[in-house]
Amino acid sequence: MKILWTLVILVSFTVSSISKDNLSETDVAEPQEAPSVEDVLKEANKSFAYKGKAIHPGCVEQFMVNLADSPPPIVRAVDVESCVSSNEFFMDYKVSEDGYIGYEYEDSGEKNYFGYKVIGKVKGGIHILDTRASGGGTMVAMTVFLARFGLENYRSFDQQEKLTIEQRLIMKCIGQIDRGDRDIGSLELINNNLVLGESQYRKKVEVINLD
């Protein structure tokens, strides 16, 4: 009887050891390091994304100019992390069949929409974004934004007035082209030239050099 109990204990100990070994190898994930600010900047420049997700269209919408005003926009720089993690842009976005990353929201009881499509990137790290916005009526305002990413220092003080300096990813609007209401013309980026096709606003193709 003692021999039998000894065998049972040995078998139980062996199974327990094997289970722990397997758990340590397969089920216990190694903690992942947070990406450096340099990696974050690299991803933004490569994919117009932040930590694996497309930048929320609400962040790009900050560059919009009120119809009653003229450019440049009041807001020309956006802290990307603060924007994508804010309560203001908690809602999901969707990608339309024609490639626009957009979202819908209500403002003063009216349904609004804003979306952007990355046309490409030119020299100097300038991203070309074709955008469309609507709200409350039939107008669909179409605007091309020129955006560029960079790192900037942000200084903050705690309750003991200790200074902390943190590098942040900043998206800046460095230019824009108004296309008008529901422009039907094509939009292409050829080398460093932005080519706007014929439309109800243009009788011939227009080429804008972005060098």
Language-model segment annotations:
Residues 149-159:
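Short loop/turn segments immediately following beta-strands, especially the blade-tip
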